[in-house]
Amino acid sequence: KIQHIEDIKKIRNIEKTVKGISNIPLFDISTWNSGEQYKHEIMKKYHTPSVDCIQDYKYSYEINNNIKEKIIKKIGVDDEKKCVIFPSSTTAICCICDYLKKNNYDKICILEPSYFSVAPCLDSFGVSYYKEYISLDENGIPIIPFSSIVNNKYNAVWITSPIFSTGIYYERQNLCLLKKLNQKGIFLIIDESISSPNKYIANTFQENTISIISPPKYIGINSQKFSAVICDYPLEQFLFDWIDVFCG
């Protein structure tokens, strides 16, 4: 069982009980959906092309390269980087966990707090991981456990930006430390799925890095969301081979 989901089930049962007693519906503070006013305003500016055919398969790996190049340019990463489109961030996480397993990354560090599906996905693929915890200084600036990561000799670090459930982004001094980890040969997986586009940190690192972004999620467009994985050529080829297995 996934503890996070079990906890949500308990909360939902409590909500039902309270509603049954008071007959007052509770406000769902964990919903991903936007308010009605925001939806109304965003639809004034959001236009999508009409669908010309609903019968044929449309595979994500058949998306025009021009579109992927525009995404790469928008993020500001090196032109040599590649872009692989996934239906969602969670499916991207699954494929990345599979990559870690198949390429012998056997000591993963998850910087906590992280998205709830990361640890269960690593578990399901049989990838060993350990958790290191971010703290905040007196000014609210994140403190990365740099020495612990180096001393424990992790070969990959899973980072969530902004720090999950906090809205706190990494400061310049944090990025310098992450860059040092990268220069030591540590593979960085950066989940920027709910990051503001002007706060992406993928362009801080040149190689041995993978970044997950999901631009529609940031502005609350959840019914047509996608996830883009920014990576180097060898990893792109791996994901192309396996995306059809996991995503259909």
Tell what function each PLM region has:
Residues K1-N66, I186:
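N-terminal "arm"/small-domain region of PLP-dependent enzymes with the aminotransferase-like
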Residues T91, D98-S161:
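PLP-dependent aminotransferase-like
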Residues I212-G248:
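PLP-dependent aminotransferase class I/II
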Residues N64-I71, D79-Y105, S227:
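Conserved beta-loop-alpha segment that forms the PLP phosphate-binding cup at the N-terminus of a helix
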Residues N33-E36, I163-G167, Y218:
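Short acidic, S/G/P-rich loop/turn micro-motifs used as interaction or catalytic elements
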Residues L136-P197:
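Active-site phosphate-binding strand-loop segment of PLP-dependent enzymes
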Residues C83, I186, T209:
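Short, conserved active-site loop motifs that form the nucleotide-linked donor/cofactor pocket
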